[in-house]
C-alpha cells in the first residue's frame, strides 16, 4: 500500500470515561419475556482509586439470532464502594420499557460528547444512551450497521446494507452520516462491498471494504471519502477481505 495515513492523536477525554468494547459470543442476556432483571453487581475485590477514568462500558455481542446483546459497566470511581464493582446487564435495568433489551449482535461501542453509541448489527439500529445514566436517548435505523467514527459533530456509520446472506449479488455497502444533535441521518455515500471499520484522518474518512458476503470474490479496497463533500474520492487497493482500519499516532 503506497498511501501512508498520518494522524495527530485526539487527546480529548470525553467525560473522563474509558471505553472498552468486549465482544463475547457466549454471553447471555438476563431478561425472560417482559420481566425486567436488575443488574448484577459483583465486587471484584480490587481497590478503587480516584482518577480521571471513572468506569468502563462493555458491549457483549451475544450469539447471532438470539437477540441478547447486553451492556455491562465496570465502576472504577469508588463513589459507591471502596472496591471496583462490575455491573452486568445495566441497560435492561436503566431502560425497563425496552423489552427487547439492546437487540441482536452488539458490534461496536463508542462515547462521543455526553452520549454512548452502540451499534446493534443484526437489529439494524444504533442505540444512543446518556453516558452517565445509561438511559436511552435515541434509536437510529441503519441497515446491517457495522462500525462508528466521529468528527465535527457527526457520526459516520458503516453499513453492509444487504441482509445477512452469503451471495455474490449482495448490494454494495454505504456509510451513513448522522447529526449528533438531532440524531437524524443527513447523508449517505456508497462505498465498497460489506464495509467494516473506518477512521477519520485530516478531513478524509477511510473505510475498509471486506466483501465478506462475496466469498471467494472478496473486496480488497479502502474507500477514501472527502468529509466536506461527502463523496468517495477514490479506492485504494490493499488486500482481500479487509476488516480493521485505524489512524496511527503520526
Q: Where are the regions that the model predicts?
A:
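Hydrophobic helical h-region of N-terminal Sec-dependent signal peptides
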Residues: 19-23
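N-terminal hydrophobic targeting signals that begin at the initiator methionine
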Residues: 1-2, 31
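C-terminal motif of bacterial Sec signal peptides marking the signal peptidase cleavage site
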Residues: 25-29
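Bacterial N-terminal signal peptides that target proteins for export
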Residues: 2-17
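Predominantly soluble domains enriched in secretory-pathway, periplasmic, or organellar proteins
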Residues: 31-250
